[in-house]
């Protein structure tokens, strides 16, 4: 199913979405921790970001700080996986999540049409995920196997 955004969301003045400058893994870990998410060894996280198909950050022109982050991996045929969705807690957290989801889904739709999308995300993002068309599964992904 293709994604079409209902309305264009706007960041507060001075904030922007960046997809060209790789964020410092230390800063991503700080953001993940603030969201109550698991953090990762710096070297492993840095490699994961570099090997991702793409990523987006939300930053401020005046402050050297991350306000949001998401990265995507995909086989470009069947699956697109959204990882490390995180947004700084506060008044704009829901807006940051929604903007990250909007730009991510637009890019997946454009570059990876037909891929099913799986998301690894914190509880604080659930409202934004639902508002962007995701169906939350309270039981999560279940492993399937076939015994030979």
Name what the model sees in each region.
Residues 1-43, 140-143:
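Short amphipathic alpha-helix that is part of the acyltransferase structural core
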Residues 38-62, 66-86:
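A conserved beta-strand-loop-helix scaffold within acyl/acetyltransferase catalytic domains
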Residues 84-95:
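A short, internal acetyl-CoA/4′-phosphopantetheine-binding micro-motif in the GNAT/acyltransferase core
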Residues 135-148:
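Conserved catalytic-core motifs of GNAT/GCN5-like acyltransferases
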């Amino acid at each position: 199913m293709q994604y079409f955004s209902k309305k264009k969301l706007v960041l507060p003045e001075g904030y922007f979405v960046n997809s060209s400058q790789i964020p410092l893994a230390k800063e991503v870990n700080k953001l993940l921790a603030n969201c109550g998410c698991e953090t990762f060894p710096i070297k492993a996280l840095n490699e994961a970001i570099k090997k991702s198909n793409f990523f987006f950050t939300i930053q401020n022109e005046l402050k050297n700080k991350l306000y949001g982050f998401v990265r995507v991996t995909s086989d470009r045929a069947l699956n697109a996986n959204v990882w490390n969705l995180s947004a700084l807690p506060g008044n704009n957290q829901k807006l940051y999540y929604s903007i990250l989801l909007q730009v991510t889904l637009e890019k997946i739709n454009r570059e990876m049409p037909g891929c099913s999308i799986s998301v690894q995300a914190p509880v604080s993002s659930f409202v934004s995920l639902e508002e962007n068309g995701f169906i939350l599964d309270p039981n999560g992904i279940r492993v399937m196997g076939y015994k030979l």
